[in-house]
Design a protein with these regions (language model features):
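Active-site and substrate-binding clefts of carbohydrate-active enzymes
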Residues: 1-32, 36, 167, 173-177, ...
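Short, well-structured secondary-structure segments
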Residues: 3-102, 126-129, 149-154, 259
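Well-ordered, non-membrane alpha-helical segments in soluble/globular domains
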Residues: 27-42, 70-75, 107-110, 196-208, ...
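Short, solvent-exposed loop/turn segments at secondary-structure junctions
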Residues: 60-64, 93-96, 133-136, 157-158, ...
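Acidic, His- and aromatic-enriched active-site or binding-groove loops in soluble protein domains
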Residues: 73-90, 123, 144-164, 169-181
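Core alpha/beta catalytic barrel or barrel-like domain that forms the active/cofactor pocket
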Residues: 85-96, 120-131, 179-186, 218-224
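Alpha-helical scaffold elements lining the catalytic groove of polysaccharide deacetylases
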Residues: 96-119, 176-215, 232-235, 281, ...
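Catalytic domains of cell-wall/extracellular-matrix polysaccharide-remodeling enzymes
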Residues: 111-165, 228-242
Length: 410
């Protein structure tokens, strides 16, 4: 979370993030849904003895917060990794939009995230899920070149050729990259069920799964952890719903749970998944509107991307980390106008009163970061001067001052 940063703070305040609020939020998340849901999922994995598998996608920054603030949750994640039934999926380290702005930066962030997964869980991600399922053919091809063999995407109808989302596809530029599209309708039905237990029972939802065409191969259900928020109901009814649903599906024998990597290896691709223009899983149009839909968002994205060369030249880890954190997609989402403060859209609460307030706060911070980068670059230039060069510069200015004094005297 960013702190409130005014124009007059530029040059006077080097701290941009509200670390206290961020820590409070991650601790609240641990209490309300992270720890209870992970405990429940671990119990289900152990109970079903290999018949229940799933994947997790957690940003690198979130993992760092969990490691620093939530040791119990980290232990649960390690225990889940040790079962062999949970796949940790790769992504950009800070949940950024770097795949849309710079190929090298996108690759760097993906590598950094994979290294974090390996460090914490001794697992190397082979499946990739871009921020909010953003995908194009070019992005998919780059993901393959980065070493991933499977990619999760949104099953937007306009991207599929003949068949529906319940199949494995391939990237048209890199046919060895397997593409798994999310079944949007069933995923949203599950999200609705978790938000309101009166809508669907586990039995009803399981029956909808059984109605899927018997010739379909795989149903990719994807949802955000926030939907496991146990404070929505009393007595952890969200987790009871999930447990009953998983039990019914496993016991039926109609379907088997698999990680994305397992499914991609078991089923042959049925065709290419084509997306020349970017598609995402965030809104009903499956486009970039949530982050690039207005001039405020576009200007902010352009500005933060434009600092990349200064960040590289300054070559200071602390400044690089700040710049990386400021690329988080949430900051641009908060500047959205069409869906601002719409509780029916997405799942992210907006801490700002208006898109303009979010924009001004963000741009003030970027302005100060740009100032600091410029100062560091100039300082490095000065530090790099030899003693003779410094003496020459001093001599030059002394002569200039003498000439000015002479003119004033005349």
């Amino acid at each position: 979370l960013l702190k409130k940063y005014r124009f007059f703070d530029i040059g006077n305040d080097n701290f941009y993030f509200d670390d206290y609020a961020t820590r409070a939020e991650i601790e609240r998340n641990e209490r309300e849904f992270l720890k209870p849901s992970l405990e429940s999922l671990l119990s289900l994995v152990r109970h079903h003895e290999g018949q229940f598998s799933f994947s997790l996608t957690i940003s690198g920054f979130a993992l760092r917060l969990i490691e620093d603030c939530c040791p119990d949750t980290l232990r649960l994640l390690v225990d889940l990794a040790d079962t062999g039934c949970v796949e940790f999926v790769g992504m950009p380290y800070n949940h950024s939009l770097s795949s849309l702005t710079d190929e090298a930066e996108f690759g760097r962030q993906a590598l950094k995230h994979s290294q974090e997964i390996e460090r914490l869980f001794d697992l190397k991600p082979t499946t990739f899920r871009n921020t909010e399922l953003i995908y194009t053919d070019n992005i998919g091809a780059q993901v393959y070149r980065m070493g991933f063999d499977t990619m999760l995407v949104e099953g937007a109808g306009r991207s599929l050729d003949v068949k529906g989302p319940d199949f494995v596809y391939f990237n048209p530029q890199q046919p060895r990259l397997r593409i798994l599209p999310r079944n949007e309708s069933i995923s949203r039905m599950l999200e609705d069920a978790l938000k309101d237990k009166k809508l669907f029972t586990p039995k009803y939802f399981a029956e909808r799964l059984y109605e899927v065409d018997e010739y379909d191969d795989v149903i990719y259900l994807g949802l955000n952890f926030e939907y496991f928020d146990t404070t929505q109901y009393h007595n952890n009814e969200v987790l009871v719903f999930v447990k009953n649903l998983i039990d019914k599906v496993v016991d039926s024998g109609v379907y088997k749970f698999q990680t994305p990597g397992m499914a991609a290896q078991e089923y042959q691709p049925v065709g290419p998944f084509r997306a020349v223009a970017p598609v995402s899983g965030m809104n009903r149009f499956h486009d970039m509107t949530p982050w690039q839909g207005n001039e405020l968002q576009q200007e902010a994205l352009h500005k933060v991307a434009s600092l990349q060369s200064m960040v590289a030249t300054a070559n200071r880890e602390a400044l690089s980390e700040i710049w990386e954190r400021l690329q988080c997609s949430d900051y641009f989402y908060y500047m959205g106008t069409e869906f601002f403060n719409n509780p029916t859209y997405g799942y992210k609460p907006n801490p700002y009163k208006s898109p303009y307030e979010a924009f001004i706060n963000y741009m003030n911070i970027l302005g100060d970061l740009e100032r600091r980068l410029g100062e560091r670059i100039e300082q490095d230039k000065t530090d790099a001067l030899s003693d003779d060069q410094i003496r020459d510069i001093i001599s030059h200015y002394e002569k200039e001052i003498a000439l000015l004094k002479q003119k004033l005297a005349n």
